[in-house]
């Protein structure tokens, strides 16, 4: 994100007991004035809200909410998201086509085939106008879980843009995932890759 000219600030939300580990993982980037670390909450939506409130102090117009388990963000994806919001979308997210045949299953019994042409695989980062997303989070009932920020826009029919996703935005959850992605993008020069996979602690 810091390599993209549209980025004015990066807010990293972490569990309070992981703050020191987050600072250590950042290395020299921790000294970058654009990087801010804040404590998250018990739920995903609490952590997103903490990040949005911290970002709101920057005065920046747009915000991208991203999943740290997808560490490799192509510059073109960021550019496409920014362009979609500037063109009038209320929200934008990268989407990949569904390439596998999908089956409806009841227990262990296949009941039907689902039309995959109307489906897509949602990725992050997801981009919004910062003041608008903050307002929606603040106004959302506290007892209703938010697992995906775009859903706050689906409920009122807002224009949500789907931009082309990227396989390099795969979600890393195991060491084998890291090895696969390292092999995929080795030699491109687009990402700064560590020689060894970092400890993976998805919370």
Task: Please identify what each model-predicted range represents.
Residues 73-163, 200-203:
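Conserved core of the sugar-phosphate nucleotidyltransferase
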Residues 68-72:
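Acidic metal-phosphate-binding loop of nucleotide-sugar-dependent transferases
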Residues 1-60:
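Conserved N-terminal catalytic core of the sugar/cofactor nucleotidyltransferase
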Residues 148-150, 167-169, 175-203:
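SAM-dependent methyltransferases
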Residues 7-11, 90, 167-169:
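Short active-site oxyanion
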Residues 51, 66-67, 97, 129, ...:
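Residue-level signal for inorganic ion chemistry
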């Amino acid at each position: 994100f810091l390599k993209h000219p549209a980025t004015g600030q990066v807010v990293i939300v972490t569990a309070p007991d992981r703050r020191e580990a987050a600072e250590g993982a950042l290395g020299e980037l921790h000294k970058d004035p654009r990087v801010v670390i804040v404590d998250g909450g018990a739920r995903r939506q609490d952590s997103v809200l903490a990040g949005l409130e911290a970002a709101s102090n920057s005065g920046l117009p747009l915000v991208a909410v991203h999943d740290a388990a997808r560490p490799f963000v192509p510059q073109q994806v960021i550019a496409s998201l920014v362009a979609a919001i500037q063109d009038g979308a209320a929200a934008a997210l990268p989407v990949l086509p569904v390439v596998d045949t999908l089956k409806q299953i009841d227990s262990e019994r296949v009941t039907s085939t689902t039309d995959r042409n109307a489906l897509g695989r949602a990725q992050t980062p997801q981009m919004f106008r910062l003041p608008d997303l903050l307002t929606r989070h603040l106004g959302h009932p506290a007892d209703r879980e938010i697992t995906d920020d775009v859903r706050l826009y689906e409920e009122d029919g807002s224009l949500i843009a789907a931009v082309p996703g990227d396989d390099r935005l795969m979600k890393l959850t195991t060491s084998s995932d890291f090895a696969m992605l390292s092999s995929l993008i080795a030699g491109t020069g687009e990402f700064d890759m560590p020689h060894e996979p970092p400890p993976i602690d998805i919370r």
